[in-house]
Amino acid sequence: MPYRISRQAYAETYGPTTGDRVRLADTDLILEVEKDYTVYGDEVKFGGGKVIRDGMGQSQTPRTEGAVDTVITNALILDWWGIVKADVGLKDGRIVGIGKAGNPDTQQGVTIVVGPGTEAIAGEGHILTAGGIDTHIHFICPQQIETALASGVTTLMGGGTGPATGTNATTCTPGAFHIGRMLQAAEGLPVNLGFFGKGNASTPEALEEQVRAGACGLKLHEDWGTTPATIDACLSVADRMDVQVCIHTDTLNEAGFVEDTIAAIKGRTIHTFHTEGAGGGHAPDIIKICGEANVLPSSTNPTRPYTRNTLEEHLDMLMVCHHLDPKIPEDVAFAESRIRRETIAAEDILHDLGAFSIIASDSQAMGRVGEVITRTFQTAHKMKVQRGALPEDSARNDNHRLTRYIAKVTINPALAHGISSEVGSIETGKLADLVLWKPGFFGIRPELVVKGGSIVWAQMGDANASIPTPGPVHGRPMFGAFGKALAPSCLTFVSEAAMDNDIQSKLRLDRTCMAVKETRSVGKSALKLNAALPKVSVDPQTYEVFADGELLTCEPAEVLPLAQRYLLL
């Protein structure tokens, strides 16, 4: 006779199942489990008196015959493709199974074999996401890496050489020497990394040199002169060498207006940074570029979401980052031209519509490297409060909104930069870069971060305590972040030309170098759940933003979730 268990007792034991709903931290966002891949009555769970024991949920299968290295049990997966409950199997640092784990000799429906060589991570009662991807990094200091990892970000792409004046302002690693040094520095950092060369040149030779030296992309920045000539030259090199181009356009409209930039791009793929404009770009209407099919538009987190403090903090940040002098009126006017409440408010709504596709940090250069995921779900919360449910959602859940927003910090930046075959989602064959969250801390403080199949970061108590949980409990680096375990768990993204140039051997790199691929064929239509193409216009006098003729405006938030409630010091 089957044993019956209440839904509440089941959720407390094995985590939520199909039809159960979970609130995310202190937001108003609710997810609902769409499907459960585990088998009722044959669930696996580790512990005294539990299932993963010899002859029960653990088989005799050796690793060589198919048993996985690690199983994450009963996890609630949140990814762009859906919200499901499943066991997840890891082997050789990659995801090899999403389904039902256990012993096929004693259990039904097993797709992930647990053996004597299998480690267990308890995922029941936790949310599992892919590691976050931040593609707007100013590599100003190496301490950013730990801060990003502590927030659930496992891949960082951008440019810089340290706290040089150029790096403080622009995400460029200029020239072969600096690219080589940064690739060597990456050896000791427990995340995936990729570096952008400086794209500001009107002839191709110096750009090609940087790509061969290991740049995985090129960055055009107005502080180095983003003119129509440099845009055309940079994109021409990128098309030949298959790397992405990122652009921060001409705020002052010195070399042309947004229409001139669009003309210079000539329909070629380009990733536009802080597309709203407060981070830089044609004033006041760079935001309209998000309606172009070849443009991959992103935001940076200082304007995510629009709050009562957003405008006030921006001016001083901008003056510092771009080496401006508050005593020079022209510098102040330059800064003030970028900060517009109307376009920042519209940015919130364009994200909710799926017209802006990516969110990144702009680390230490107006943005905060440890707040990408937090700011993303604060924006989702604010939009639910102000705009209500999306048409695709129901009164029961916010599943479509949640999958749309998680895509902005996982799969979409991966697609934009040609690394989606390796990272960006929870799919078999991809690198096991995974983040486990307690629902009450979702988006603000990961419980566990797995990098290439090894735990690299976790909430951990006093190391001198008798058990792992006594306080002070805080995030700390784990064994996967140390020694020779680090290199095989991480990837360094470079160009195919750099691989042909044998850059890994020339620089004596231990980490696996991986070439970015198909960066020139990706268009906005390829970006998951964020491919809307509204016709956007900006009133030049009032700065009001319209999409398909409709005014986009919203009030600033007075208070946000995922904030001081979690960060009292």
From Swiss-Prot:
Carboxylation allows a single lysine to coordinate two nickel ions. The keyword Hydrolase applies. The keyword S-adenosyl-L-methionine does not apply. Pfam families: Amidohydro_1, Urease_alpha. Its cofactor is Ni cation. The active site is at H322. Pathway: Nitrogen metabolism; urea degradation; CO(2) and NH(3) from urea (urease route): step 1/1. Substrate binds at H221. Its EC number is 3.5.1.5. It catalyses: urea + 2 H2O + H(+) = hydrogencarbonate + 2 NH4(+). Ni(2+) 2 binds at K219, H248, H274. One of its GO terms (biological process) is urea catabolic process. GO terms for cellular component: cytoplasm. Residues 131-569 form the Urease domain. InterPro entries: Amidohydro-rel, Metal-dep_hydrolase_composite, Metal_Hydrolase, Urease_alpha_N_dom, Urease_alpha_subunit, Urease_AS, Urease_asu, Urease_asu_c. GO terms for molecular function: nickel cation binding; urease activity. The modification N6-carboxylysine is found at K219. Keywords: Cytoplasm, Hydrolase, Metal-binding, Nickel. Ni(2+) 1 binds at H136, H138, K219, D362. Belongs to the metallo-dependent hydrolases superfamily. Urease alpha subunit family. Heterotrimer of UreA (gamma), UreB (beta) and UreC (alpha) subunits. Three heterotrimers associate to form the active enzyme. This is Urease subunit alpha. The gene is ureC.
